[in-house]
Structures are given as structure tokens and as C-alpha cells.
Amino acid sequence: MILVKANLSLLGGAKKETQFHGSEGKQAAQQKIMVVKPALPWDDHKPRITWRGDGQLFAVSSVCKESGTRKIRVWNRELALQSTSESIEGLEQALSWKPSGALIASSQSKPNKHSVIFFEKNGLVHGEFTLPFTKGQIKVKELLWNSDSTILAIWLEDNEKDESSSGCCVQLWTVGNYHWYLKQSLNFGTDEMKKIECLMWDPENAYRLHVFSTGWHYFCFDWFWGTDHSDGGQGDVAVIDGDKVLVTSFQQAVVPPPMSTYFIQLSCAVNEVTFQLEPKKNSGIAILDSTNILSIYRYGNSTVNDPTVKLGAVSGNGFRTSSQTPKLEKKLRLPRNACDVQLRSFRLLTWVQDDTFLAVSQESNSSISTVHHMNTDQMDGQDINVRDVGTITGHIISLCYSPNTKHCALQTSNGKIWKYLCEYPTPAVEPWIDSMGQEVKFPQPCVQTALASIEGEDMVIGLTERSRLFINNSEVASNITSFHLYEEFLLLTTHSHTCRCVSLRDTSLKALETQLNSASNPNDETIRKVERGSRIITVVPCDTKLILQMPRGNLETIHHRALVLAQIRKWLDRLLFKEAFECMRKLRINLNLLYDHNPKAFLDNVDLFIKQIGSVNYINLFLTEIKEEDVTKTMYPTHALSTMQSSEGAKAKKVDIVCDAVRAAMEKWDPQKFCLSILTSYVRRTIPQLEIALQKVHELRESPSTTIVSADEALKYLLFLVDVNELYDHSLGTYDFDLVVMVAEKSQKDPKEYLPFLNKLKKMETNYQRYTIDKHLKRYKKALSNLSKCGPDYFTEFLSFVKDQSLYTEALELYPHGTVEYKAINAAYGDHLVSKQQYELAGLIYARCNSIEKALDAFIASGNWHQVMCMASQLEYSGEKIAALARTVAGKLVEQRKQADAAVLLEQYAEDYEEAILLLLEGAHWEEALRLIYKYIRLDILETNLKPALLDAQRNHMILFDNQKTTFTRHKERLSVVREMKEKARLGLLDEDVTGCAEADLFSDTSSIMTASDASGKYSQSNSRISSRSSKNRRKAERKKHSLKEGSPLEDLALLEALAETIQMADKLRGDVHNLLKVLILFEYDARAKELQQNFDDLLLLFETSIPEIWPPSVQQNTAAPILGPHSTANSISISYQHQRNVNISMQDSELFTAPKLNKNIQWKLSLLL
């Protein structure tokens, strides 16, 4: 017994009396309710119960005892009545609650139609659709929703009095854009043994339908969503809508179903549609209806209208469409013996060749599938010639064909792939074998398959219901919602709401897998964001449109950048500049690609480019966008470099090349029409040729009757391209005052500003006038040239101008050698160089103008003693004066530690050979000192000076080597300690808190390039103060930057720097030690020489063995790079980010991580001492 709550309050306006009735007013609620007729005669009067998907509510359809009509009541789990439907006349017994919970479906027989109606849970009607039958033709037995609420199955029976002879069928309906589509119609005929007894959807597989018949026959139907589209022509896509096929030509119009470009009207429900797979052209469309009639439509030039093909949303009265429509060629029947094998025997219909179709069938009560070869070259109305070409163990669930390779792939329910060989003398079916000799089998069965060429091999691509994408035996991605193949591209949509466009050309399966699973780069052109739930419908052939469909049914057109660039490159390869330009302009592709794609082809066909583009505005747009950047390497890189740089491009600049080539073509084609574009070509050069452009404007003004563009229009256009002040200055630079006035009149300048200046210029002599203009425009070189032409009276002003602008080299070119002006310029130039402390060059300049005294002083200051003696000779100095000069210069050379040069001066010019010998001994030039000793027979110096100097030098070297060895060893040991501390800190093994420690951020051998923020802040502030100090203080601060103080933040850097300096300093002593050893041996100091050689050899050996320890490979490869990846830790990631912040420090100190090189080419040892 069911207990019901009596007083039920309906919220939300569920009662009709509380509803708004519009213009009828509240009186409408008081109108007398019409009497509703009782339930239909064939109604079994049994109640129907249906539950909502979540089990919280259920609905009951029952016949009222009082009125005899059916009503729907909604109850909750506690048996509390929630609502009662309105009294609906003709309401039938069928009842099904949509699992998603939105609607309750039932059926209604109306006076003029039969409908499926929907109720909300409050009992009010919410929408309906009409069944494609006449009044009283059928009766609705049951309605069933599939588990994901996307398909509504309707069980229908003929409304015959004799039930034993009545037929039955099942229709599958879907909804999109608020329109209901009849997608499939399954006719079970009138055979009593095939009459349906039970119909149900699979609870797990949403697209599997189970049917049981009276004769104990069991049928299982599996469906998958697919898109029927053409591969060429107009980009046609077909949608099944009951007895109509809606066809949209996306090349002509993008309209979402149920709208279409045209539709094909059939006499009964359509079950399958297939296009002839011919790339780049519309060839035909074949339609298989529920009565197994195959209708073949072909595209052609026929002008006869086909009554079955009607225009849709893109046309109407008074409108014409450019879309091509097909014409019915013939209708053929499937043979009855084939149709009677099993219900809807033929499926997966595919049009593979002109008169050839493929289809598959399933044998009753068997797992054997048969592949059928269907020939359709018969006459209209005849049976199709069907031939079995092979059987496969298993249920074939997909079939795909490639018109390029003529291969066909079939997939069974276990994922195994079979190949249909249609090109063999006898068609056959065999397992698909890959290049490794393995059978291809998807890990899971796929609902969509396609054939693609990858690495020169045909591979099968498959997508499962769970978004897993397979290529042959490999899974390449697991988040794919749809895919589409277009030429060499694989387009995919993903669960992350992106659309990828991947080129299959010159790629491998491994690279493709890596690309699909890698994180997207912000600048990656192969990926773009799309709306949530988007699915690919088609790509319009020979265009850039990619059509996506949203979950609610509406369409979106996008132009994926990879597709756009590929199409543009094809147009450019075919020299279709206009198509490429218009696409680039519309989709905002950089116009530099027109040239950069193939510079040689562009320059060779620039006349064709001008002819195709034709528009002055378009050519101006192209010229203004040209820049030096090669966009094929920066913005739009390709794997295969298609560009071929011209030989001219290697020398000249790209902008100049393009401007000159385009201008030459325009002047050849029609200079009057392209006048403004020619001006643009002058302005857009690397160095704008504004004077020539202005001269062109002036020519237009001189001959206005012969031009299309007036001078005023041209000048206005130039003012649009160039700043008015800049244009005024360039017009002034032409020295044409008429042109200057013309530009000034078009500007906003006040005549009081420029007229007095122009009047003053007109009164000047021509050269001086031009000098004044160039000086005003700061064109100093031209001004200097014009001033030099004014004559000797203006030379004083000329020289003053040279000094002011430092134009000495330019001035020297304007006067011949030997003239007074030439010498005066040289003298002034020499004075200028002396002020810049360029003494040697100043001396040369003075010497050229015979200012020998000044040249002598300059050479003395520069230390060039050879030229000093030359100048002294020219001045005819006396012997005493030359000796004094030699002593002065020698003293300066000694200060510069050039004792050998000073010794030459003292010996040859001052004749003080003894002082020369002492200087040579001081500079350790032992052999040269010996030469002078024996030359001047001063053997006493051997005992008094040479031998003591030798012993002192040996002793000093010994002390130096010991000090270097001690210092080097100490620094090396300290570096090991510092590195060990920082390695422990990196591994987190130190007990104390390392956050505030100075070494806390130094976590590896080379981590000293990542300085702590405290230290970096300290040194950055220090550097800002250092910038204003003297060079001496800057060098001092630089030395203090890396402190050797223990515990300093950069101690390891300081140690590396000190060790490298020690090695380099000692390595440079090889030659000095070699020379000292020779002289020690000469004077029989063998023991001291051997000791020196051994100590130096030990020091170098220490350096050589220590370098790999101090600079291991990990240090030289900069292991402080970001530590990321699966083995990274929180500390390492933090360090990586800190490394990026301190990249400048790493650049400055990177040389410290390179080991110093020892010069082993110098043979410094003496074999006598070994």
C-alpha cells in the first residue's frame, strides 16, 4: 500500500493558476478546462515506472480511473508525491527519464501528428519533436535513453489490427542545437520470429543496444560517433537527419546543423553516408537508406535541377549560391540474399574507387566477419554486384582507406589491424605488418581510425573512447578528444582545451610521441587554445579553415597558424602572390614571409608580384612592413629550409634589395599608377632617400597634366610617412627653395619661422649658401666640402670649423699635398692628437708637415726612441746634444722596464757602454751583456757585476719558487675544505641553520656563481659607488671583490682566481729560467743551476697534477645550471631560480671555471742538468 502526502505545496510556479498568462490576463486561469479524451484504444493501461539517474526520484505513468487519461506523477524515495503532469490528450504509455535528470520522455498522439514530448520534474511540458509518420501509422511501444543521455531509442510497431502481421522498428534519435535528428532506423520486418520482445541499452557501454526477438534471436548493436566529410572540393560535411542528408560546403558557408548549404531528400530514413575519397575535388556522395537502397550522387556541370537536392540556409528567393550541388546518378539495390543474412547486414560502407565500394557484414551466431567488394557499374534500379573477398575472425568495428596509397585498414574488436589489398589481381585480406615485421594491434579497440605516412611507412592511427591515441602498436598520447588528417598534418584536440597541428613530414614516431607529451612553449605555433569540449569536424581543402564543433552543437572556424603557414608556402611555391598576400593580410601573418620564403623566386618574379597584387595600398603595406629580420628563422621557422638566399642578399641589405626591385618593377609596369608606392620605396630604404622622393614630388608639380597623382597628394602622403620636420630638413638639403616652400606650406610651421631664414640664404654666394644649409642640418662633412670651395678668404673659418667638429681626416682630403692649407691642417691635427695623448700618431702628423720640433717632443712622450733619433738627425743636433737626448730617452725607457732599448741608446748614441752593460744585467739580458763586455774588453765586470748578479738572480728565483709552492698548496687545501662544506650544505647534512649562513646558497662545486641575495645586494651597492672613483680605486675595488678571507661569500672564487694567477705567473718564467740556466752553466755554477732547474720542475709538476683536482670536468661544464627534472628537490629548484637571478655574476666569473693552460712548447730544461 502506497501512502501519499495529501497537502502538497508546489514551488516555482508549478500550478497552472500561478503562471503568467501574458495578454490574456488572470482570466485565463479561470477558463474552463477542456475535457480530455481517455487513453488510446491500443494502450495496455498498465503503469510505467522510470527512475531518475541518481535514484532520488521516480516517475509513474498511469491511467486515471476517473477520467481514463494517462498522467505522469513524480515521487521521491520516501513516496512523497512531488508533482502531477497536466492533462495531455493522447498521452501514451511509453515513459523514460533521462539519466542526466533533466527531462522525462513520453509520446503523444495528436490529431495531425505523432510526437515525442518531454516533461520537467514539475510535470510541465518542456519541448517535443515529431516522428516521421502519418497519423495512426505507428504506435510507440517504449522509449529508452542510453546511459550518457545522448541517444533516445524509440521502439515502434505498425498500428495494424492484426498484430501477428505488424512490423516493428527501432529508431535512434540525438539532439544538437535544439534539433532532434533521426540517426538510425532498424527495420525488423513483419516476420513473427523477428518481432522484438525486449529492448535495452547496455548499462556500461553507452552506445551498445541489446535486442531480443520472439524467435530467440539476440542482436547486439554497437555504434560510434563519426563525421562524414569529403577529402577535397568544397569541404563538404554530411549530417544524417531522418530521411534527409544535410550537406554543408564549408568553403562557401560555415553554418551549423540543422542548417546546411543544401540537403538531399530521400524517401525513407538514411542509415549511412559516404563520400568518394578523391583528394582536392568533389566526386560524389553515396547514401544507404533503411531499405538497403544505395543512392549515388555525383558532382558535375549539369544544369538540370535535381528535385531531391534542395538548397538550405544559404539561399532563398532572389538569392543564388556559388556552391556546387550533386545530381542523382542512379539508385541500386543490395541483393536480397545479402540483406536477409542478418538485420542491417552491410555496414562500414566506404567508397574507395570510382565504381567500387567496400562493406563488411557479420554472420549470424558467429564471430566471423566478411569483407565485401561491391561493384556499382550497373544501370539504375539494378542489383549491386557483391563479391566476398575475404573473411576475418572477429568483429570488424572500423574501416579506413587512404586514396593516396590505395591501402585499406580494417580493425577487429580486439584491436588487431588487417590490410585489404585492392590493387592485387585478386583482392585479399591479410594481417597488417609493420616495418619491424610485427603484426599491428592496438592495445585497445579504437572508435576512429585513419591511415598516415610517417617515416615513409603507412601507419594506422587510432583513437579510443578513453582518449588514448595509438599509432600502430604504440600509444603516443592519452588526452586526445578528436583527430583529423589533412595532407601532411595531424590535427588533434585535447582535454586541456588545445588544438595541436603536428607535421608528419620529416618526423619519427618517437619524436611525435615526445612532442605530444611535452609541455607547450608559449611561442609554439603548433598549439593554440580552443573552447572546452571542441571536436574537429573537418579542414577545408586548399584553404586555412579548421572547423570545430562545440558540445552544444554550434560551430567555430579557426585558422591554425601551422595550417595557414603551410598553405601560404604552397601558394608562394606556385607563385600565387595575390592569394598568399590576402591570406596573410587577413590573418595578420608578417608580410616579410613573401620575400623570406624564397628570396630568389621573389626577385625573379617581382613583375608578376606587382601584376597580381595590383593595389597601390597593398604594395605600400608590403613595403612598410619589410624589415631586415628573416622571419623563416625567427617567427616562422620550418624543419626543412626552403629559402635560398640570393647572392646579392649576402652583400646588400634585404630592405634595400626589396625596395629597389619592387620600385624597378613598378616603374616598368605603370609609374604613374604606382607613384605613391614608388615614393614609399624611397622612404623605406635603410637610409631613406628623401631627397629623391622630394624631387619626384617636384617633378609632379612641374608637369601636373600627365600624372594621375597630384603633387599635393604625393606630398601629403610623404608627410604621412615621414615626420614633417625631418621632411622639411631634407627638402632644405636639396638646395631647392621652391621645394622647401612647398613642404613648409603643407606643414604647421609659421611662415615667420622659415621665410626670414630662407631669404637670408638666398642672398649668400652659392657655395657658402650650401655650407650654411649643411651646417644647419648638421651635415658637417658636406658643409666642410662646400666651405672649401669658397676660396682662401674663408680658410680661417674653414680651419676653425675643422677644429670644432674634429674633421681633420676629411679636411686633409680636400687640399692637395704640399699646400699651405694642407700643412696648416696637419699642424692643427697634430695638436689635437697631443691633447688626446695619442703622441706617436701626433709625431707622425707633425713630421708630415715638417714640424720636426713638435714631432720630436711627441715621439719622446710616446717612447718611440727610433723616431726620436731620426728627428734629432733631421734637426742636425750636435754629438753632445744627441748624447744628452739619448740619456733622457733611456731614463724614460728604464722607467718602462725596457732596459734593452735603453742600453742600445747608451751604447750607440751616448757611448756609455759600461752603463749600458749594467742596465742589461739589471734587466736579466745576460747574453747581450756578455756581448758588450767582450766587445769593449771589460772583463773586470764579469767578477764585479755579472757573477754576483747571476747568483742573486738564482737565489731570488729559488725564494720565489718556494713562496709560490707554499701559497699554492695552502690555497688548494683551503679550496677543498670550502667545497666540502658547501657540498654538505647542499645535501642538507649540516646541523646549523644554513639559511642565514653566507655559504647557504653555494650548493655545488661551481655554485659560487649563485651568490646569496645579501651578498649580491652588498656588491651591487658597492659597484654603484665605485663607478665614480678613479681608475686606481676601481682596480682596488675589483681586487677586493673576491676576498680570500675565510668564510667570505665568494671565498671559493677568490681561491680559484689566486691559484690561476700563481700558475700563469710561474708558467711565464720558463724563458727567463732557461736563459739563467745557460749562463750559470757557462760560469760553472752547475750545482746552483741544477738546484734551480729541479725546484722549477717540481713546481710545474705540482701545477700539472693539481689542475684536474682544482678544475674537474664538472666545474668546467658549469654544474650550477638549473637542477630540474624528476630527480630535483625543493632545494635544487630554489637554487635554479636563484641562479637565473644572478646570471650576470656567472657571466663575469665564468672564466674562473676554465683551467689555465701550461705552455709546454718552450723547452726550458738543459739536458746537462738532468
Curated annotation (Swiss-Prot):
Biased composition regions of type Low complexity, renumbered to the chain: 1018-1030
Region feature (Mediates dimerization): 722-1170
InterPro entries named among the record's database cross-references: A-sol_ELP1, Elp1, ELP1_b-prop_2, ELP1_N_b-prop_1, HB_ELP1, TPR_ELP1
Metabolic or biological pathway: tRNA modification; 5-methoxycarbonylmethyl-2-thiouridine-tRNA biosynthesis
GO CC annotations on file: cytoplasm; cytosol; elongator holoenzyme complex; nucleus
Record-stated family: Belongs to the ELP1/IKA1 family.
Protein name: Putative elongator complex protein 1
Originating gene: elp1
